[in-house]
Structures are given as structure tokens and as C-alpha cells.
Swiss-Prot record:
The gene is secA. Residues 924-933 have a biased composition (Basic residues). It is a peripheral membrane protein. PROSITE patterns: SECA (PS01312), SECA_MOTOR_DEAD (PS51196). One of its GO terms (molecular function) is protein-exporting ATPase activity. It comes from Halorhodospira halophila (strain DSM 244 / SL1). This is Protein translocase subunit SecA. It is an enzyme of class 7 (translocase). May bind 1 zinc ion per subunit. The keyword Glycoprotein does not apply.
Length: 933
């Protein structure tokens, strides 16, 4: 109550922030009359004047008011669009490095020009980030006219672009591109073999369009550059044959207090997106695996040697039970194509990690593509935090304001609309069954069509959109479908969606970034007439459009129908936001049923009881604010759970990110250096010193020395045959310190002889090539080992250890081990390999170029069922498994924590029966403790 009173008296934090910014709008407007008097040349000269003032010590804040006024005047002349005062407000928020929440149709693309121009004056490059290549090209071309008028260079980066074009795009003042392309270019730059191969400059200012989609929805999906790893197609196929022979447990067979009761072999927890084997299911699975010859006669699933089998069984169970065709993926060109759960778009090239994608391919009887080993990866959370300054804009960010602040340090400010919002958002209608719900939706659509009112129907899956499409066909209602299967004609469908009586079915937010104009898109119609259209035809088209527009307005504007609530309120708000743009009339309503996923999982019992008490008949619906609040509370639960997942992932990924920064910094120093001889000499002396200490401990007596072992190591690892034992036999006064100096001196002499033979310049070139290649090799193996560690560390929670602290401790130890290993490896290569000419160095670089050609760029979709659903049942293990959702494992399952291939592990103690007490001392049975699958 007190907070409500305080808000009324003092205003909200948002109100106070906007009030402070509004004072500057008057100053911006005051520049307008004088700027209108300037010629084009005088207006264009302002850019150089601003740059000169910056060079003299003024700040961007000092220039803001006049610079914004210049952009507004230039936009009026070039684009015929003048920025509203609320758009100036939004741009100031963007310049301050925050998030501007502006409703659909408020001109976010135009708002961006103000902040982008101001920050581009520094000459350090501004990146404008969009959600797809179409929008990047469109905005670069559309707004590029304005920037070029003001003397700014504009570039656009897209996939498969020639290197020269990409370099030019990044050298431009303003660069448009997608989040994926910017991220992949960053990773590729940090794998470059020559500094000339790098394309990006330092990361200065990023302005992210649809910031909620990129920084929230895709936060758990890392960008991965990978190479082919070991193929295990036969094992995936065998598991796919085995899973249908296991019987699913029905919900009524497993009471809440004892979920392992019942005859089934496994049960599916839809809320947690997990699959668990029952006690009988373990025995049945072992029996089937023995039949297939996948485990030994006396083996169990618990044996360490079978961890790979468990991994594949887990993937197959998830593929068969949690992932449905035409809901979670499509089959296109004999390949599994993932469908984005947030936008409903197909995502070619993206693959689930942890073997899930291969398991789905096996389930569908498709060719199984090789698993990939991660060469480099980064999450969007960590990539965008590399920029000195980050800002974003969207129509729906307020519900995630805490996460933006907590993770990225970005404030969300809601900008008022230019015209008042008049859309009518009706209460949800809740039906008992999906059939009743669809009957009501079709009746509503028929009513709208009869009144010439356009309808946009939002569905949560391709399956739902096609079910509704079939029902409309049967009812004789013409309509357009916009989903991942029909995205080629997306722009045309969206352009026509505002015409009188048009019905458009779209999955979630397909078509986001394109406005639905009431009456249809007039600009597109006029553009189709060509460069020199007949004026009479233009007038006729305008008159037709005006007539259509008026009919739609009189019918009530665009009517939005939601067929199901999404897990996130923000996605629902985006769907509603398609209607009522810029003060247009409009309406929206969600139709729900107790069979919908969200209600079935989170709110069904309470809601079902409520409807039963009301004695509802077939076709009756309940409509009340109380029902809407129950649904909103369910959504809040899911949002909180998803936020915890993203936060959990970030805490783990921050460890890898700190290591990534160190490795990339060292790599860039190597790349930039013309001569790394000093570094190589220091590393060689350090490595040789440690090798000597392994066999001759410092301060030890002669009897403790392992001279034969030292001679063998120097010969096998470093190619140096030194008669150390003979030296000791021949020279009585050769003690430890002088022996160390002599070994170092002999190795130094051998290296200098090699240098003299090949030439100093050739050896310098070779040193750099070897250092880069060895660093990349060890970093790749370290990434695989880190993923392996991340998947298993949750199990330590059973031993009352904190998995996060354990991960940090082990990851640090592994990183130290990697650094020592790469130094030793590099010294070994440099001492062993004979380099006689520049061609030998070129051969190393050519090998590297061939490896680069085999690399694959992919945006790893999170495997919604957590990693190790079979291997980690609940508690800390389950939490870690959930964290491992999107871990880019690739070939990690073939790697041990040290990066070596899998080995058969001998059991150290006696075999523990499943019903015996757990050896950890917890007092629980083994199957309920450390042996829990």
C-alpha cells in the first residue's frame, strides 16, 4: 500500500528518469528552425564539425542535442520522416546504454538512427544487431540513405560473404548484421592464423534490435564453431530400436509420494522436461542392451565403462518422448530442422547438442550426421558483455527488467506512445477441451470476416497452426498460413494481413519486425509499379487503399486471437502488440483449454476444480479476471524457473569465459607479434627446467636421481640425445646446479644450430605458426574436457559438495594443466621438427587452412530436456543436468576430463548391489544415493 502511495506522490522510477530526459527535448527542438535554413551541403558539414569538437575534448553528451537535431532534419529531407519527441526520448535512453521499450509501430528503426549517428562520430564503429539477415539488409539500405547523406559509411555483414566485403563492412562507421554473424566473426577472428585474416575491430557500441529475443530467449544457446569428431551412428540406431520396446508409465500409476510404483519402464516429467527410468526399467534396459550386445553379460548400467551407453540411451529416450515432429522439428531435405519455440521459425543449420540431434535423426530413420567437436564457443550473454557500451530496443522488455539489470547491467525504460493506445484486450476464455476451444475460435473468425475485420491468429506450434488451418478449410474460410514451412512468402503474407476480412495464422511471432498496416501495405503496392509509375495509377491505388483502410478501421481494426498462452508473458504481449499500432483501433483475446500445455502442467487441478463446481456444459467458457490471474501466476513460475536456468548457466559459463579471455588475449599477442623468439626461449627454458625436476628433484641426493628416465624423456619428447649418465661418470664435480645449466646449454646450442641451418626468418615464422597451432589444439581439447566436467559435476551434490565451487576449482586446475601441456607440446614440436625452408612453414599453414574449411558454424539449440536426464535424477544432479542443457559438447563424450580418449576403467572396490547401503555413508540405499540413474 505504501509503495502505491509513494508512486502516486513521487512517480515511478521510470517517470522520474523520463522527466530528467525530457528537459533536453526542448533544447533539441530549439535547434530545428536554424537547421531548416541550412543547405544540404551545410547540413552535411555538421558531421566533420562534430568530429572536430570531439577531437578538441568535447564529449558525446555535449554534442547530443545538436547532433539529434541534425539527424532529425536530415531524416526529414532524405526519408520524409521527422522524429517525434517520444522517439528522441527513446534515442537518449539508447545513447545512455540502456533498453528502450517502445510499442509496436512506434518507429524503433528510426529511433536507432539518432543514437547510432551520435556514437558513430567517435570513428570506433557501431554495430546494429538484428534478428535476421532480411532485416539487416533492409535497415542498412533504408537507413543507409540517411547515414550516407550525413557522410557516414554503412556496411552489412551476412553469412558466406567474401572476406574483402566483410572487412570493408566492419571498417565502416556503422555495421548492420545479425547476432549470429557478429558472434561467429568474433570466434573466427580468434582462430585466425594471420592478423590480416581478422575482420572485426574492437567491440565498442552495440545497439540490439528486438533485444529481448536475443539477450533473453537465446541466452542459453551458445554459438559454436566445430569440427567433425568420432562417428557413432550404429549406437544411435540401436538405441532408437530399443526405446520403443520400453513401456511408458502412465501418470495414474505413479502416486506423488512414490513415483517409482507401477509397471512402466520409464516416466516423463513434462514440467521438468525430463525422462526417468523406473527401477524395473533399469533391469529391462540392461536386459535389452545385453541382447543387442551393447553391454557385457555381467555388466550393469552403473559400470564406468558404460557411461557412453547411458548417454545414448538418455538421448534416445528424450528424442522419442519429449520431441515431436512438426512441433519441435521439421523434416526437410532428409534432414531434421529445429523449430524455434519462441518464433515458430525453422532454423536450418542449428543442431541440438549432447547427441540429441543424432537421436532424433535415428528415430526418424534419417542419415545420422557425425557429432562435432567444439573448436570455439561463446554464449550471447558473454559476447555482448564484451562491448564497451550496449543498448537495446524492443516492444516487450518490462517483464524481464530484473534480468536485464542483473545479467547485463541494463536499465529498462518504457517510452510513452506517440498516440494513445486504444486496443481492447479482452479477458481470456477458458474451455474444458481443445475441440471446444477451436470451435469458439472459428466462430470468432467467421464473425470478423463477415464484418470485414482482419484477423491474426497466433499459435504456439506448427502442428497447432496446421490443425486450425484444416478446421478453417473445412469451414470454408479462406486464410493464409505463416509458419516455418511457409516462410518464403512471409513478407507478402504480412503485407496483406491488414486487408479487410483477411485471416492470417502465424506461429508465435513469425513476421516480427514488419508492421501490419490496416488496409494493406500501400508503400509495397506503389513500389511494385516500378520507378516511373503512371500518376493516374498511383492515385487509383491510393484511393483503393484509403477505402480498405476506412473499412478496417470501422470494423474495429486488427483482431488478434491467441490459441494458447505461451510460457512467457512477454511472448503473449508481443502477439497482442501486432494490433493497435500508432493509435489504430484493435482488439485481442486468448482462447484456452485445460488441455493446453501451460494449464495442463501448471494450473490444471485448481482450474479443473473451479470449472467442475460451476457445472459447465459443452461449449461453455469461463471468463474472469481471477482465471487470468491464475494463468499469469503460472507464467510467472515458468519465467522465474527459466531465469534461474539462465543465471545458473551464466555462473558456470563465466568460469569458461574468464579462461577464454586469457587464451584469446595471449593468442592475439602471438598473432600481432612479428617475432616470438623471446617468448619461445622463455617457454623452452621453463619446460626443460620442469622436465629435469621431474627426474632430478631440486635439492635431492644423487641416489634419488632418475637419470635414465631423464635421458629417455628428452629423447622421446624433445628429440634430444644427451649422454647425461656419461657426463656424471666422467666428471666428479658435476653437481645438480651445473648439470641443469649444461642440459639447458646443450638444448640451446642444438636449437641455434637448427636456426642457422634453416635461416632465422624461417624459424621465426615457424615458431609463430607452431605456437598458434598448439594453442588451438589444446584449447579445443580443454573445451571438450570442460563440457564433460560440467555434465558430471552435479553428482557431487550427493556428497554434500557445492557443484559450482567444485566446477570452479576443477576448471582452474584443468586450465593450469592445459597451459603447462601446451607449453611442453610446443617445445617438443619446435625441438623435434626439422625446418629447412619456408615451404615447411607453408605446409603447416596449409594444413591449418584445410582444417578451417571443414569447420562448421552452428547456433546450438538448447536441448530442453536437461543433459543426463537418465544419469541425474534430482536434487543437485538434476540442477547440474538442467544447467548442461545447451552445453556444446560435440565430441566431448569421447573425452575424459584430461582430454584423453575413453579408457576401460577397472572397478577399485567390490561391486555394490542396488539395494545395499551406499558406500558414501549416507545411510541410504545405493540406488537412491550415488547409484541413482
Amino acid at each position: 500500500m505504501f509503495s502505491a502511495i509513494a508512486k502516486r506522490v513521487f512517480g515511478t522510477r521510470n517517470d522520474r528518469a523520463l522527466k530528467r530526459l525530457r528537459k533536453r527535448i526542448e533544447a533539441i527542438n530549439a535547434h530545428e528552425p536554424e537547421l531548416q535554413k541550412l543547405s544540404d551541403e551545410q547540413l552535411q558539414a555538421k558531421t566533420d564539425a562534430f568530429k572536430a569538437r570531439l577531437a578538441q575534448g568535447e564529449t558525446l553528451d555535449d554534442l547530443l542535442e545538436e547532433a539529434f537535431a541534425v539527424v532529425r532534419e536530415a531524416s526529414r529531407r532524405v526519408l520524409g520522416l521527422r522524429h517525434f519527441d517520444v522517439q528522441l526520448l527513446g534515442a537518449m535512453v539508447l545513447h545512455d546504454g540502456n533498453i528502450s521499450e517502445m510499442k509496436t509501430g512506434e518507429g524503433k528503426t528510426l529511433v536507432a538512427t539518432l543514437a547510432v549517428y551520435l556514437n558513430a562520430l567517435t570513428g570506433r564503429g557501431v554495430h546494429v544487431v538484428t534478428v535476421n539477415d532480411y532485416l539487416a539488409r533492409r535497415d542498412a539500405e533504408w537507413m543507409g540513405r540517411l547515414y550516407r547523406f550525413l557522410g557516414m559509411e554503412v556496411g552489412v555483414v551476412v553469412p558466406r560473404q567474401p572476406r574483402e566485403e566483410k572487412v570493408a563492412a566492419y571498417q565502416a562507421d556503422i555495421t548492420y548484421g545479425t547476432n549470429n554473424e557478429f558472434g561467429f566473426d568474433y570466434l573466427r577472428d580468434n582462430m585466425a592464423f594471420r592478423k590480416e585474416d581478422k575482420v572485426q575491430r574492437d567491440l565498442y557500441y552495440a545497439l540490439v534490435d528486438e533485444v529481448d529475443s536475443i539477450l533473453i530467449d537465446e541466452a542459453r544457446t551458445p554459438l559454436i564453431i566445430s569440427g567433425p569428431a568420432e562417428q557413432a551412428g550404429e549406437l544411435y540406431e540401436a538405441m532408437s530400436r530399443l526405446v520403443p520396446r520400453l513401456q511408458a508409465q502412465k501418470p495414474e500409476e505413479r502416486p506423488e509420494e512414490n513415483p517409482e510404483l507401477g509397471p512402466g519402464d520409464y516416466y516423463v516429467d513434462e514440467k521438468a522436461r525430463q525422462v526417468y527410468l523406473t527401477e524395473g526399467g533399469h533391469d529391462r534396459a540392461e536386459e535389452l542392451l545385453r541382447e543387442e550386445g551393447l553391454i557385457g553379460e555381467n555388466d550393469s548400467l552403473y559400470d564406468a565403462r558404460n557411461i557412453n551407453v547411458v548417454h545414448h540411451l538418455n538421448a534416445a529416450l528424450r528424442a522419442h518422448t519429449l520431441y515431436e515432429r512438426d512441433v519441435h522439428y521439421l523434416i526437410r531435405d532428409n534432414q531434421v530442422v529445429i523449430v524455434d519455440e519462441f518464433t515458430g521459425r525453422a532454423m536450418p543449420g542449428r543442431r541440438w547438442s549432447e547427441g540429441l540431434h543424432q537421436a532424433v535423426e535415428a528415430k526418424e530413420g534419417l542419415p545420422i550426421q557425425a557429432e562435432n567437436q567444439t573448436l570455439a564457443s561463446i554464449t550471447f550473454q558473454n559476447y555482448f558483455r564484451l562491448y564497451d557500451k550496449l543498448a537495446g530496443m524492443t516492444g516487450t522488455a518490462d517483464t524481464e527488467a530484473f534480468e536485464f539489470q542483473h545479467i547485463y547491467g541494463l536499465e529498462v525504460l518504457s517510452i510513452p506512445t506517440h498516440r494513445p493506445m486504444v486496443r481492447d484486450d479482452a479477458h481470456d476464455l477458458v474451455y474444458r477441451t481443445a475441440d471446444e476451444k477451436y470451435e469458439a475460435i472459428i466462430a470468432d473468425i467467421r464473425d470478423c470476416v463477415q464484418r470485414d475485420q482482419p484477423v491474426l491468429v497466433g499459435t504456439t506450434s506448427i502442428e497447432a497452426s496446421e490443425r486450425l488451418s484444416k478446421a478453417l478449410k473445412d469451414a470454408g474460410v479462406e486464410h493464409n498460413v505463416l509458419n516455418a514451412k511457409h516462410n518464403e512468402s512471409e513478407a507478402q503474407i504480412i503485407a496483406d494481413a491488414g486487408r479487410p476480412g483477411t485471416v492470417t495464422i502465424a506461429t508465435n511471432m513469425a513476421g516480427r519486425g514488419t508492421d501490419i498496416v490496416l488496409g494493406g501495405n500501400l508503400d509495397q503496392e506503389l513500389a511494385e509499379l516500378g520507378e516511373d509509375p503512371d500518376p493516374a495509377e498511383v492515385e487509383r491505388r491510393k484511393a483503393e487503399w484509403q477505402d480498405r483502410h476506412d473499412r478496417v478501421v470501422n470494423a474495429g481494426g486488427l483482431h488478434v486471437i491467441g490459441t494458447e498462452r505461451h510460457e512467457s508473458r512477454r511472448i503473449d504481449n508481443q502477439l497482442r502488440g501486432r494490433s493497435g499500432r500508432q493509435g489504430d483501433p484493435g482488439s485481442s483475446r486468448f482462447y484456452l483449454s485445460l488441455e493446453d500445455s501451460l494449464l495442463r502442467i501448471f494450473a490444471s487441478e485448481r482450474m479443473s476444480g473451479m470449472l467442475e463446481k460451476l457445472g459447465m456444459q459443452h461449449g461453455e467458457a469461463i471468463e474472469s479476471g481471477m482465471v487470468s490471474r491464475v494463468i499469469e501466476n503460472a507464467q510467472r513460475k515458468v519465467e522465474a524457473h527459466n531465469f534461474d536456468m539462465r543465471k545458473h548457466l551464466l555462473e558456470f559459463d563465466d568460469v569458461a569465459n574468464d579462461q577464454r579471455k586469457v587464451v584469446y588475449e595471449q593468442r592475439n599477442e602471438l598473432l600481432e607479434a612479428d617475432d616470438v623468439a623471446e617468448t619461445v626461449d622463455a617457454i623452452r627454458q621453463d619446460v626443460v627446467e620442469k622436465v629435469i625436476s621431474e627426474h632430478i628433484p631440486p635439492g635431492s641426493i644423487d641416489e634419488q636421481w632418475d637419470v635414465p628416465g631423464l635421458e629417455r624423456t628428452l629423447k622421446e619428447e624433445f628429440g634430444q640425445e644427451l649422454p647425461i649418465q656419461r657426463w656424471l661418470d666422467d666428471e666428479d664435480d658435476l653437481h645438480e646446479e651445473t648439470l641443469r645449466e649444461r642440459i639447458q646449454g646443450e638444448i640451446e646450442k642444438a636449437y641455434r644450430a637448427k636456426e642457422a641451418e634453416a635461416g632465422a626468418s624461417v624459424v621465426r615464422h615457424f615458431e609463430k605458426a607452431v605456437m598458434l597451432q598448439v594453442l588451438d589444439k589444446h584449447w579445443k581439447e580443454h573445451l571438450a574436457a570442460m563440457d564433460y566436467l560440467r555434465q558430471g559435476v552435479g553428482l557431487r551434490g550427493y556428497a554434500q559438495r557445492n557443484p559450482k565451487q567444485e566446477f570452479k576449482k576443477d576448471a582452474f586446475a584443468m586450465f593450469q594443466e592445459m597451459l603447462e601441456g601446451l607449453k611442453r607440446d610446443a617445445v617438443g614440436v619446435l625441438l623435434r621438427v626439422q625446418v629447412r625452408a619456408e615451404e615447411d612453414v607453408e605446409a603447416v599453414e596449409e594444413q591449418r587452412r584445410q582444417e578451417a574449411e571443414r569447420m562448421q558454424m552452428r547456433h546450438a539449440a538448447p536441448a530442453s530436456a536437461a543433459a543426463g536426464a537418465v544419469a541425474a535424477g534430482s536434487g543437485a544432479a538434476g540442477a547440474a543436468a538442467a544447467e548442461g542443457d545447451s552445453a556444446p559438447t560435440g565430441g566431448a563424450q569421447q573425452q575424459s576430463a584430461g582430454g584423453r580418449g575413453q579408457e576401460t576403467v577397472a572397478r577399485e572396490g567390490p561391486k555394490v548391489g542396488r539395494n545395499e547401503s551406499c558406500p558414501c555413508g549416507s545411510g541410504k540405499k545405493y540406488k537412491h544415493c550415488c547409484g541413482k540413474l
